[in-house]
Amino acid sequence: MKILHVCSELYPLLKTGGLADVLGALPQAQNQIGLDARVLLPAYPAIIAGIPNTQVVAEFDNFAGHVVLRYGEYNGVGIYLIDAPHLYGREGNPYHDAYYNDYGDNYKRFALLGWVGAELATGLDSWWRAEVVHAHDWHAGLCAAYLFNKGRPAKSVFTIHNLAYQGQFSYHHLYEIGLPTGMFHVEGLELFGQISYLKSGLFYSDASTAVSPTYAQEITTPEFAYGLQGLLSGLKAQDRLVGILNGVDENIWHPNVDQYIPHHYKLKYMAGKKKNKAELQAYFNLPQDESALAFVMVTRLTEQKGVDLLIESADEIVKQGGQLMILGSGAPHLEQGIRELAERYPQNIAVKIGYDEALSHLMVAGGDVILVPSRFEPCGLTQLYGLQYGTLPLVRKTGGLADTVVDSTSESIKACTATGFVFESATPEALRHCLQRAFALWQKPRAWAIVRTDAMAQDFSWRKAAEQYRALYERL
């Protein structure tokens, strides 16, 4: 079965979030179970630099101007690149300029991505024709609309990685992107008086997926649906919306092979974890104290990620003699709040504003607890990395966090199912109480070791997800 993944990021060449990690691993896992998966991407400078050897598949002019479609390989996966420098030849973030202003031609840049995705199901490459076009997030949402317009020559699947980003553009762009005005309708592309690329993906695809079972349920409710609850609950009722958990790329995220950490370790040989903790404490200029409970957080600094909840309750970590290390960037007021914490408690709290791939690996490997107190979290990958590395996740019960972390209670520890710490209410008080429970378990080294062992024994391999996607494709 020939699968075309249509997306806008690919780890490690270009990454702004978890979407890139998924596309860096899922196609490879699908090929390993006998599918023929390829990826379609815009030819951003970072992508071209990483895939320099390509051949021309097609050259054409359409609503987006002059376009060259190229084909190459990366990590054994076939990659199509849409080479249109006037649209994609911009360094840095693929969606906005250095001042965080969305590019004014995003409607055209991502319409072209969807258009080429549909054309690859109708013979644009005479050697390979997609049987399933699998589009990811709003950037690729128009794939399904173009396929619908062509009489549905292939099956279509749309994956929601984050429903909060909807790709909404003015109605008057419709004629510029080659779609009939009849599609601008509540039973179509229209959402709140605008074109919604995300809604297009949901409405016109044969099936949609969310990146965890709980998130697939949550987005049918007004709190999480951003005005799409009617459409989403309808899809759920028809069994056209399912949740499939993301996996972990074990070639990159495994403590026994991780190229970024100085000391490898595994479940049966944990000495390396203590050494990584000492390295991490040294990096952040915190006391190299093995007995201090070390909390780490690697995140975008936004309210969605619960950073404000942590700012309000971090003094609990200090009070109990713990340490807190944070890596991330985001909202200026939250960056400032985190910096002030580090200045107030220099012996206990340290922060690095920005992103650093190598440091993020050392933090996951060297920490004792990884904090993911999100208000909502479609799937979440950092808690999965935490489980893999024996760094117990402390999470809020939402989305993929609820599906992947089992709270440590006396019952779950006895039953060998506990894998971390879970709190329900998105309040500083609830987070504070959960931090206290983590300290209480840390005082019982044998119980802590049991939970850590059970955490590391979890299977979140991409093979599992690849099999679930295959089952979905086969029933379309």
Curated annotation (Swiss-Prot):
Residues that hold ADP-alpha-D-glucose according to the record: 15
CDD domains: GT5_Glycogen_synthase_DULL1-like
Enzyme kind, highest EC tier: transferase
InterPro entries given in the database record: Glyco_trans_1, GS/SS, Starch_synth_cat_dom
EC number(s) on file: 2.4.1.21
This protein's pathway: Glycan biosynthesis; glycogen biosynthesis
Reaction(s) the record says it catalyses: [(1->4)-alpha-D-glucosyl](n) + ADP-alpha-D-glucose = [(1->4)-alpha-D-glucosyl](n+1) + ADP + H(+)
Keywords: Glycogen biosynthesis, Glycosyltransferase, Transferase
UniProt KW Glycosyltransferase keyword: yes
Protein name according to UniProt: Glycogen synthase
A GO cellular component entry from the record: cytosol
Biological process annotations from GO: glycogen biosynthetic process
GO molecular function: alpha-1,4-glucan glucosyltransferase (ADP-glucose donor) activity; alpha-1,4-glucan glucosyltransferase (UDP-glucose donor) activity
Transmembrane residue ranges: none
UniProt source species: Haemophilus influenzae (strain PittGG)
